[in-house]
């Protein structure tokens, strides 16, 4: 490496070490459809091996938001990668797509190989769990763009679904049932508010909350719904799905409903994790607003015919997912969501 480049703030050797450290984690994620190895200019994936008649590709990209600030401040980098994958694959899953491959982007003030390895390990762990190949990525050292120790993580996922099996909400009808799949906690949305409330409260994040350190509760990774939902889709006709992310119930559930229909949700039908009670009390936040910011304990929803509810709940239980019948579909021309009990 030239001295001029090093003096400009770019350490190529640290980048090489980071790649070497992450390679074993990346290799764990490979699928048989991946062509070639690491280091190429473009990553390749053989769709013909999927044995699909008319595959539709579904893509999604997302980041982790300011949850990163907590991870950086407390030096806990191993679960943020899980969040990055979950935010992308859970989104494309709502179409019925099986995630195929993932690419990551990490930008940082300075490449610290040990930190990059922890981030990529988390990404790889999530990719292994969802059978998604981590086929490419970029690590950019940009000292003038970020403060010391800071980094950003984003991801891009591609999946595929048979054209005839594509889930778009067009079959939603009155009387169908909304099933909610439990979240693991806050997931990756609302953290600008969360961090504000943490700062205002003055709490010690190493202290315990509900038998766990506060910091572990706040950094609990976003739940991955791919395996249980794909297992459910094989057995039950799913009419629509939603990933409950930014905007909570109010912004996300209507996205999968056709005009003239609403989801009537009974908020007493599922448990709300205690951390949401803490946030609401700390910020004196109206309950309706809480449902417009956070997932409130439900990270993903599926809509099925009433006759399929018992079978759906049984399948999800077999997949070790807590799920609840949280509402049903009604006709409504004025709003797409009705929340009862708030």
Swiss-Prot record:
Enzyme Commission code(s) on record: 6.3.3.1
Pathways per UniProt: Purine metabolism; IMP biosynthesis via de novo pathway; 5-amino-1-(5-phospho-D-ribosyl)imidazole from N(2)-formyl-N(1)-(5-phospho-D-ribosyl)glycinamide: step 2/2
Reactions the enzyme catalyzes: 2-formamido-N(1)-(5-O-phospho-beta-D-ribosyl)acetamidine + ATP = 5-amino-1-(5-phospho-beta-D-ribosyl)imidazole + ADP + phosphate + H(+)
Sorted UniProt keywords: ATP-binding, Cytoplasm, Ligase, Nucleotide-binding, Purine biosynthesis
Subcellular location, record wording: Cytoplasm
Annotated GO MF terms: ATP binding; phosphoribosylamine-glycine ligase activity; phosphoribosylformylglycinamidine cyclo-ligase activity
Top-rank taxon: Bacteria
Gene3D superfamilies: PurM-like C-terminal domain (3.90.650.10), PurM-like, N-terminal domain (3.30.1330.10)
GO biological process: 'de novo' IMP biosynthetic process; adenine biosynthetic process; purine nucleotide biosynthetic process
Alphabetical list of Pfam families matching this protein: AIRS, AIRS_C
Annotated GO CC locations: cytosol
Family note: Belongs to the AIR synthase family.
HAMAP family hit by this protein: AIRS
Name this protein carries in UniProt: Phosphoribosylformylglycinamidine cyclo-ligase
């Amino acid at each position: 490496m030239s001295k001029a480049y090093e003096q400009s703030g770019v350490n190529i050797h640290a980048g090489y070490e980071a790649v070497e450290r992450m390679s074993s984690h990346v290799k764990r994620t490979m699928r048989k459809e991946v062509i070639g190895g690491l280091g190429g200019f473009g990553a390749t994936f053989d769709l013909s091996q999927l044995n699909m008649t008319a595959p539709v590709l579904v893509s999604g990209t997302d980041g982790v938001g300011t949850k990163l600030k907590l991870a950086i401040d407390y030096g806990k980098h191993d679960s943020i990668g899980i969040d990055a994958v979950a935010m992308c694959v859970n989104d494309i899953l709502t179409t019925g797509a099986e995630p195929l491959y993932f690419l990551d982007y990490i930008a940082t003030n300075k490449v610290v190989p040990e930190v990059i390895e922890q981030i990529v390990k988390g990404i790889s762990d999530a990719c292994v769990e969802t059978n998604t190949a981590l086929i490419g990525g970029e690590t950019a050292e940009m000292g003038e763009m970020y403060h010391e120790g800071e980094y950003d993580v984003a991801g891009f996922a591609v999946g595929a679904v048979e054209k005839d099996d594509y889930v778009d909400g067009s079959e939603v009808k009155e009387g169908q049932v909304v099933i909610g799949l439990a979240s693991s906690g806050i997931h990756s949305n609302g953290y600008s508010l969360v961090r504000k409330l943490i700062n205002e409260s003055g709490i010690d994040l190493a202290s315990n909350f509900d038998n766990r350190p506060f910091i572990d509760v706040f950094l609990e990774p976003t739940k991955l719904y791919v395996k249980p939902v794909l297992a459910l889709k094989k057995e039950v006709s799913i009419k629509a799905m939603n990933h409950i992310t930014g905007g909570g119930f109010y912004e996300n559930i209507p996205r999968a409903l056709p005009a003239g229909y609403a989801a009537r949700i009974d908020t007493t039908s599922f448990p709300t994790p205690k951390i949401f009670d803490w946030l609401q009390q700390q910020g004196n936040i109206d309950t309706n607003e809480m449902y417009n910011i956070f997932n409130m304990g439900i990270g993903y929803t599926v809509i099925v015919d009433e006759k399929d509810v018992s079978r759906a709940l049984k399948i999800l239980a077999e997949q070790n997912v807590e799920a609840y019948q949280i509402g049903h579909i009604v006709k409504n021309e004025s709003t797409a969501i009705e929340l009862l009990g708030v």
